[in-house]
């Protein structure tokens, strides 16, 4: 092989080497300028542009984070508002029933005032009876009912405060009622205080 041919061969190898070097993708950090990008891919290697994807994901994460913080703040405000409403309800829960009882209080005061002027006991008695009926109507409107005290003693509804013998009553039957008991919507709010028969 002649010197000229050898030189040409070496030159071709050098050119091929240089072309291959240009085609080679240098993906290491700090060498991004060696990439030719096309449609978010490296023209040289077909790999995605990870930097853009990372920025996009960071933006999405930030958006989700802000959305979460807003919802958390909304929930905290909702909770505080509901707590305030519950406190208000507790504070004025008895307002309705108290308002109803005010009428009975007015009637009591009028009955006392009227009887003190006229000294008429019968009128006072009638006034008191009317007030008792009024109070029972109020209680009935709130589903409050008197606990029955006829027949056998029942510890769920009655509170025995004493025993005594009785020829008219059977063992464990109620002999006497010392204080009436009441239920509200089926729940005992005050048991009846009774005397029970023991033979």
UniProtKB/Swiss-Prot annotation:
Acetylation keyword on record: no
Compartments, as annotated in UniProt: Cytoplasm
Q: What is its main location?
A: cytoplasm
Can you quote a single GO CC term? Answer: cytoplasm
Gene Ontology process terms (BP)? protein folding
For this protein, the record's Pfam families field holds: GrpE
Keywords of the record: Chaperone, Cytoplasm, Stress response
* Record-level Gene Ontology MF annotations: adenyl-nucleotide exchange factor activity; protein homodimerization activity; protein-folding chaperone binding; unfolded protein binding
Task: Tell me which InterPro entries the record gives.
Answer: GrpE, GrpE_coiled_coil, GrpE_head
Key word Chaperone present in the record?
A: yes
Subunit (UniProt)? Homodimer.
Q: PANTHER family, per this entry?
A: GRPE PROTEIN, GRPE PROTEIN HOMOLOG, MITOCHONDRIAL
The role this protein plays is: Participates actively in the response to hyperosmotic and heat shock by preventing the aggregation of stress-denatured proteins, in association with DnaK and GrpE. It is the nucleotide exchange factor for DnaK and may function as a thermosensor. Unfolded proteins bind initially to DnaJ; upon interaction with the DnaJ-bound protein, DnaK hydrolyzes its bound ATP, resulting in the formation of a stable complex. GrpE releases ADP from DnaK; ATP binding to DnaK triggers the release of the substrate protein, thus completing the reaction cycle.
Q: Which family does it belong to?
A: Belongs to the GrpE family.
This chain's protein is named Protein GrpE
Query: What gene name is given for the protein in this entry?
Result: grpE
């Amino acid at each position: 092989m002649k010197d000229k041919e050898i030189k040409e061969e070496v030159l071709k190898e050098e050119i091929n080497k240089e072309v291959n070097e240009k085609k080679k993708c240098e993906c290491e950090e700090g060498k991004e300028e060696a990439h030719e990008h096309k449609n978010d891919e490296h023209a040289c290697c077909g790999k995605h542009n990870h930097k853009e994807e990372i920025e996009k994901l960071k933006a999405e994460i930030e958006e989700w984070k802000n959305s979460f913080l807003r919802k958390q703040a909304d929930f905290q405000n909702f909770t505080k508002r509901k707590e305030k409403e519950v406190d208000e309800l507790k504070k004025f829960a008895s307002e309705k029933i108290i308002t109803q009882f005010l009428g009975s209080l007015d009637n009591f005061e009028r009955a006392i005032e009227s009887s003190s002027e006229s000294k008429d006991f019968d009128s006072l008695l009638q006034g008191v009876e009317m007030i008792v009926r009024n109070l029972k109507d109020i209680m009935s409107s709130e589903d409050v009912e008197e606990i029955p005290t006829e027949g056998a003693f029942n510890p769920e509804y009655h509170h025995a405060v004493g025993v005594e013998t009785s020829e008219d009553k059977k063992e464990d039957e109620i002999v006497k009622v010392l204080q009436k008991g009441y239920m509200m919507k089926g729940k005992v709010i005050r048991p009846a205080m009774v005397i029970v028969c023991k033979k």
